[in-house]
Amino acid sequence: MMNYLKGGEFLIKETQAQDIFIREEFGEDQKMMLESTQDFNEREIRPVLTRFEEKDYALVESLMRKAGELGLLGVNVPEKYEGLGMGFNTGMLICEEISSLTGSIATAFG
């Protein structure tokens, strides 16, 4: 069972060195989700980057729906709420990657 952080707890909670999440220690699930997110970025976001500057809200809505269908929006949501239940670290990994091309997606993603 995953130990979920509550709210902004990660900002003030004391962290042990062995609990720090580094790329060299990604599990297979994290690698798979990262690869899926990178594919999503290249296939769906990169080709339409210039449209973000035009404030195309329908585009952002469409992309967020597609991200949701892939499970990218529910990575760290517990399974009992129909998320993937992969935990905080995996959620942050996906957030970092999906936000890497444009701040608009970073803002929409949360």
Annotate each PLM feature:
Residues 27, 52-54, 84:
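A generic secondary-structure micro-motif detector
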Residues 28-43:
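A non-catalytic, amphipathic alpha-helix used as a structural packing/dimerization or gating element
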Residues 36, 62-63, 93:
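Short Gly/charged-rich anion-binding patches and loops
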Residues 69-110:
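Internal helix-loop-helix
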Residues 39-47, 66, 70, 97:
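Generic non-transmembrane alpha-helical segments
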Residues 1-29:
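Intrinsic disorder at enzyme termini
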Residues 48-69:
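Short secondary-structure junction/hinge motifs that connect adjacent elements
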